[in-house]
């Protein structure tokens, strides 16, 4: 969601450091989360920004936009509302610590900054992982932290399939019906 909102802010030529203008823009925007073909999507004023969520310009500015406290309030409420309406898996940097702190199944998926940068490069993306990690962990509003009851999975040496298998294994151990 934060990437979608960042894209929207940039599309409207709003300076990502102008908190007041960002808030004004978002408070008048219609942000919808829905499911289509069993896939979640975000629409902002009826536009689906999915193809732009990993654009370099979004990568460069997402931490600036997402650290605005009112932006976080708006989006956290949207995510909580969506979770109340649907059974779902939600991923994000503060899902287990801020958005859904009471969920019984929390995983903190991580990898070394070097591996994450390599993965992004293979996907054709440029992202300053270490810079973004520092910005996200030091922001005042919802800083990046590992929830105290989250299970940490270091994926540095794992394939996507192995990560999925590990999550399923841990869910089964917790009694989740799979």
Predicted regions and their residues:
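Conserved AAA+ ATPase core "coupling" helix
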Residues: 111-122
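C-terminal alpha-helix
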Residues: 166-174
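A short beta-strand-to-loop transition that corresponds to the Sensor-1 phosphate-sensing loop
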Residues: 92-93, 111
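ATP-dependent small-molecule kinase phosphotransfer cores
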Residues: 2-86, 99, 114, 126-131, ...
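ATP-dependent carboxylate-amine ligase
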Residues: 176-178
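Small-molecule kinase domains that catalyze NTP-dependent phosphoryl transfer to phosphate-bearing small molecules
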Residues: 34, 79-86, 93-103, 122-167
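Structural signal for conserved beta-strand scaffold positions within catalytic alpha/beta enzyme cores
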Residues: 48, 108, 152-154
């Amino acid at each position: 969601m934060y990437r979608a909102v960042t894209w929207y802010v940039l599309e409207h030529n709003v300076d990502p450091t102008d908190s007041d203008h960002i808030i004004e823009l978002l408070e008048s925007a219609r942000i919808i989360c829905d499911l289509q073909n069993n896939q979640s999507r975000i629409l902002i004023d009826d536009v689906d920004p999915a193809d732009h969520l990993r654009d370099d310009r979004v990568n460069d500015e997402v931490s600036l936009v997402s650290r605005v406290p009112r932006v976080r309030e708006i989006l956290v409420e949207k995510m909580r509302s969506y979770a109340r309406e649907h059974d779902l898996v939600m991923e994000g940097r503060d899902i287990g610590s801020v958005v859904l702190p009471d969920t019984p199944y929390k995983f903190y998926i991580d990898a070394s900054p070097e591996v994450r940068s390599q993965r992004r490069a293979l996907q054709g993306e440029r992202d300053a992982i270490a810079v973004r990690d520092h910005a996200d962990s030091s922001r005042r509003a919802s800083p990046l932290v590992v929830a105290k009851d989250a299970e940490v999975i270091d994926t540095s040496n794992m394939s996507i399939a192995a990560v999925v298998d590990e999550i399923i294994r841990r869910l089964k151990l917790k009694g989740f019906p799979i």
